[in-house]
Amino acid sequence: TCLIAFALLGIGSTILQVSLNPLLTNVVKGNVLASSLTAGQVLKAVSSFCGPFIAAFAATVLGNWQYLFPIFALLTLISMGWLMLVHIREESPEQSTSSWGATFGLLKDRTILLLFLGIVFVVGVDVGINTVAPKLLIERCGFDVTGAGVGSSVYFAFRTIGAFVGTFLLARVSGSKYFRVNILVAIAAMIVLFFMSGQYSILVLIALIGFTCSSIFSLIFSMAIQARPEKANEISGLMVTGIFGGAVIPPLMGYCTDLIGTQAGSLIVILCCMCYLLYCSVGIKTRK
């Protein structure tokens, strides 16, 4: 029963990710789209942050942590009702339903293919940094496993702050320039991270990487939709499948770490992903 419930939660979460982004394109356009997608990432991060507190409230006040499930169900029903009451005029350029083949056929478009790989690598960077941060503190600073978790916490916190700041900046500045500047700073921080062994210097660099990479997922997503706006639904579904990068990059990191013998192997893999993202920021042009 629990496995079925978790499967349904995963399916529902994926459906939301696929459907909400093209729905948003009917409300906002251009650079504001990237800003709005980033705002969605902020809300998602804040919601994730609140989850443990809701569980604690259910356990201490209501007497059982399992009461968080009815609370989540109620919040979901409220959100669904709210969305149903909001009138959104949806564009319907095509009446036919796209097949799997037609959706993945979009990868024949060079721009869509490059941006799809961008999603794969940016998710890989996100999961990779979250994974390697505690290991760096253990390897270079002598932290124990429990204390090393501060690395992931710092990354997550500054990723949320960066997405919040990006929400406002992307409504005022060019998305391509914002993308370019942030990924350049992230690459610089990553290169410096190879040589740092102090606790605070490592945490500062991890924070900087989290801050600068926070809006890149949304920027790539909006670039893909702007490249083929008439295929927004198909592109949204296609891009969401790119999150499998979070399952592909960490094993590569592990292999390189074993090969080299230090976490520098993991950093090399992440740096290569960032270099590809730099190419996306300067080599891919989409319509405004």
Predicted features along the sequence, with ranges:
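Helix-to-loop junctions at the C-terminal end of transmembrane segments
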Residues: 162-175, 257-258
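C-terminal transmembrane helical hairpin of 12-TM major facilitator-type secondary transporters
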Residues: 176-220
